[in-house]
Swiss-Prot record:
The keyword Ribonucleoprotein applies. GO terms for biological process: translation. InterPro entries: Ribosomal_uS8, Ribosomal_uS8_CS, Ribosomal_uS8_sf. PANTHER family: 40S RIBOSOMAL PROTEIN S15A. Part of the 30S ribosomal subunit. Contacts proteins S5 and S12. It holds the Pfam family Ribosomal_S8. This is Small ribosomal subunit protein uS8. It comes from Mycoplasma capricolum subsp. capricolum (strain California kid / ATCC 27343 / NCTC 10154). GO terms for molecular function: rRNA binding; structural constituent of ribosome. Belongs to the universal ribosomal protein uS8 family. PROSITE patterns: RIBOSOMAL_S8. The keyword Transport does not apply. One of the primary rRNA binding proteins, it binds directly to 16S rRNA central domain where it helps coordinate assembly of the platform of the 30S subunit.
Length: 129
């Protein structure tokens, strides 16, 4: 049993991406579904589906451009031992706008750019580039 389910999801995606796998399965939760939705909206993954009745899993289809990975890196920022919070004007940019930050706000989980536009701060979950 893992204590940080978001880090587990990011690690599974990173490992599958390094092996050039087409799909990766992740145990489902509301937070993970929101992160997968953001990754699809931003073009980092092709698609995702939810399967199963009792134990639902999210099947994420990774995206490649020829032999090049679309996801170059993933980094978990806020950890169970050290939570990282940022106000709306302090949400960091990733690689000068080439990547995204995922932020958990009072209005839901969204990208750092949308959080800045909504003037909502929160917990910085991850960086993806």
């Amino acid at each position: 049993m893992t204590t940080d389910v978001i880090a587990d999801m990011l690690t599974r995606i990173r490992n599958a991406n390094q092996r050039y796998l087409k799909t990766v399965s992740v145990p489902s939760s509301k937070v993970k579904l929101e992160i997968a939705r953001i990754l699809k909206e931003e073009g980092f993954i092709s698609d995702f589906t939810v399967e199963g009745d009792v134990k639902k899993t999210i099947n994420i289809e990774l995206k490649y451009q020829g032999k090049t990975r679309v996801i170059q890196g993933l980094k978990k920022i806020s950890k169970p031992g050290l939570r990282v919070y940022a106000q709306a004007n302090e949400i960091p940019q990733v690689l000068n706008g080439l990547g995204i930050s995922i932020v958990s706000t009072s209005q839901g989980i969204m990208t750092g750019k949308k959080a800045r536009l909504a003037n909502a701060g929160g917990e910085v979950l991850a960086f993806i580039w």
